[in-house]
């Protein structure tokens, strides 16, 4: 079974200096016969992109992450006619895929149609409810998600005032804690979440989280905890569940 059968062409967001991550993502997709499109970006401070708006709010966001996701989504809208777009950062872990007892196409078809965006990878500070469900603003992680075309258009219209501009107008679409997840995955239509994939903390030489360190900082602690949690759930529980079991929450 090709587990990624039916997946739309992946749009992979990559920091241009991190060639190892690009090679990793290309090799993983190649294992499943999938050819992604890569979007490689310089660091925000080295680019000609611009974010305008409330300076105090902008200071709280990751400008490179925010801008690269929006530019990628806009490019997908302008250059495809696909009804579904799937977006990856370059640090997605694919080990969960071997535990799926279904393929990607079957998973999407099993979900009722009342969603416009779907978060497919998360970083969790506590044990999440392991069932496809409505995303909450504390569901962190922007590593992988699907957008319907209509949702993506509303999002792009909100942040870009001119079609070809590299100027993004920063504002939270709802009164929520500022984060790129909430910029992208809140406020433009119903959003679901379920961790089909995991956050990769292991496989890179470029700057990333080291799972072996003893002194966890504010970022590494939740990321390592979450990685181990999701990996264990898929290996121990998810691998024994049918797709219908997952949809019905029998492994939650």
Tell what function each PLM region has.
Residues 1-88, 92-252:
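An acidic/histidine-cluster motif and surrounding catalytic segment
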